[in-house]
C-alpha cells in the first residue's frame, strides 16, 4: 500500500536511552520501555522477556508502531537510532530516507513555480525507505534476538488488527482527502463510502502482515532487491515517480559518529548530520553555558529572552549549514565551545538582536562531519 504525506514519509525516530544488556546477566535485571502505544510497549516487554536487550526491544516496538502508529512510523520511511552499549560506547545508525537517483533540483517546479504539494503527496514525495535497513543492521550487530521472529510477531498484530482510539481517529480524519487519492490505501483505512472507520473499529492490515512475513522468510533482500522493490518501480512508472529498482539495491544504513558535548557537568550525546538535532542542541547549550541561567527564574523574561536568542542564532546557522554530510560540507565547529562563546557575545540582554545572516565557525571549510 502506498501512502504519502511528505518527502519524509513516515519517520520512525528511535532514541535508545537504555543500556544494552549483554547476554548472561542475571534474570532480575531492571528494564523499561516507553512508546506511544500499549501494543508497542508490550512488544518491547516481550522482547526483554525472551532474552533481548534494548536494541531488540526498540526494534520490536518500532515494527509494532509501523502497524498501530503508521502516521509516524513504518518500514515505508526512515529512522535514526542512537545506541549506548553497556561498555559506554555510543553508536549512531542512520536509516534516513534518500532521494531517488533521478531526483533533480527543479523536480518540484512547474513553469518555474514551486508546487509544494508535489513534495508532500504522491510519487515525487517519496524517498528510498531506510528504516528496515537500520533495524536489520542494529539487530544483527547489537541485538540478541532473531529479526525474523520480531517481524512475525508484528505481522500477527497486523493480521489480527487493533482497535482504533480517539488519538488515531483525529489523525486519520486529517488525511482522509489524501487517502482517497490512493485506492489501495482507501480500502484499508476508509469504509466503502470513503469515510474514516469509527472508534472501536478493529483495523486489520493483511498486506502489511504479508510484507513483514516475506521479509522474515526471505530477509531484507525481499524488500530492497526483490519483489517489493520491483513492484515499487512499476507503481512509480504508472504514477510519474522517479524511484527505480536500483535505488533500493544501492540503499544501505550507515554507522555514524555521534555528536558529543558537555553542558556544565553533563555529557550530551546527539545524532550527527543528516539530523540537525544533535549539532544544534549542542550549539544552543554551548551558547547558554555562557550565561548564569541558575540565577534566573525559568519563567522570567530574562531567561526566556536568552534561550530564545540562543535558539535563533542556532537556527539561522541550521538554515545555511545543515544538510546530508555525504553531499554537503557541514562544519564540526558548529558544536564547538569556542564558536559558542563568539555567538553568545551577539546576545543583547536588553533587546532582540538582528539575526539575519549565518555565522562562520572556525575551519568551516576543512573540519567537517
Where are the regions a protein language model picked out?
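Extreme N-terminus nucleophile/cap motif
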Residues: 226, 284, 366
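Extended, domain-scale alpha-helical bundle/helix-rich regions
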Residues: 277-279, 283, 313
